[in-house]
Amino acid sequence: MLTGAVLSPATPLLHPAVTGRAAVVPELRAACARAVTQLLTGEPDTVVVIGPAAATGQWNPFGRLDPSVFAPGLPATGHRSLPPALGLGALLLDQAGYAGRRRLQAVGHDEPVSACVRLGRRLSETGTRSALLVMGDGSARRTLKAPGYLDERASAFDAEVERAVRAGDLGALQWLDQRLAHDLMATGRPAWQVLSGAWPGQGNDAEVLYCDAPFGVGYLVAYLRPSAASTPHR
């Protein structure tokens, strides 16, 4: 049973070692913290962090992110780092004080839609109360100063994701075009499509806490939970 899901960007701006004590986009960090806190009110047995990486696979649930992956000048831990998206998800759980079971699930950047959906279905069939923390960015081509420069298609792509999430229609994320997402540098695509496989139904209650494109990259923070009508009595 899925108790809830959070969508969060996987931006280095969430890591204090990158931005220092003063958050560069404080409202983004605040939205992520609030979303994760809401996720944990569902009392999941396990939180599954899903994020894009070089290849699909599970990572050590006790692993940590080495900040030096973002910039060589940052202090290195000396240990093998988690992929950035998973490491940032783990950091959000740590900051929320979560000490329960966690699973860190990477999904390859180039995984086809069908494989992402199958993985999501497997994650939803554990027989336990699970919550999903889904890490990934929207398009990185929203403005002239964006990492990938301006692509006129970027805003419409991010708006399509936002519409599906606001409507609680996570199954619609299956229809995101993989090639277009690649062209737009939308790294969240495979993780979102894992979510669509895990939780394909409509009518979920959704709350979008942040949706903007600072520095030309689309960031979406949202919390979703089963609607009251679809939640079984415990």
Predicted regions and their residues:
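A short aromatic-anchored loop/beta-hairpin motif
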Residues: 1-81, 86
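Cap/lid and interdomain-hinge subdomains that line or gate substrate/regulatory clefts
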Residues: 76-121
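Active-site beta-strand/loop microenvironment that shapes enzyme catalytic pockets
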Residues: 110-159
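Polyanion-binding loop/helix "lid" in catalytic or ligand-binding cores
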Residues: 165-211
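Long, Lys/Arg- and hydrophobic-enriched amphipathic alpha-helices
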Residues: 199-234
